[in-house]
Amino acid sequence: MKRIVLLISVAAIALLGSSKVSAQGKYGPDSTECIKYLSYYTEYYKQKNYDAALPKWRQAYKYCPPTSRYSMLSDGTTLIRNLIQKNQNNPVYKEKLVDSLMTLYNQRVEFWPKYATSSLNNMALDMYNYMKDEPAKLLEGLTGVIEQTKSKTRPNIFLFQISTAV
């Protein structure tokens, strides 16, 4: 009898514990901050005021789960690319920004598989644009993208891979 009560208690606790994870909702545990910063950065982004949008986007990225909105990750790639262009003369900072850009692409692939092919193709283009000074790393990245996208790989990515390998 005690074993049955114990088993029922454990099962009830397990169910209650797992329900908290799904109860967070689309915008995560701090949904008000998430929605607020999504709204703020989006307004600046629509106006192409990327300098003003970037700090608000960073806050949205901090408070929102990657699954809250696809545009948060895709807009983030545009904002980071803009920042990379402005910091061409600072190689250390540029390298960190490129790493952040690749992280955003990986999150897009992981959390939004519907858009994985286009995300991977865009990732390969940005790899080619920003990693030319690291040919081994570039070749490895391009090869990885081609292996994942297979027949849906953009033709120019094959050319980039060949030119990098030579």
Regions found by a protein language model. Give the residues of each.
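Bacterial Sec-dependent N-terminal signal peptides
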Residues: 1-30, 77
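TPR alpha-solenoid repeat register
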Residues: 70, 119, 154-158
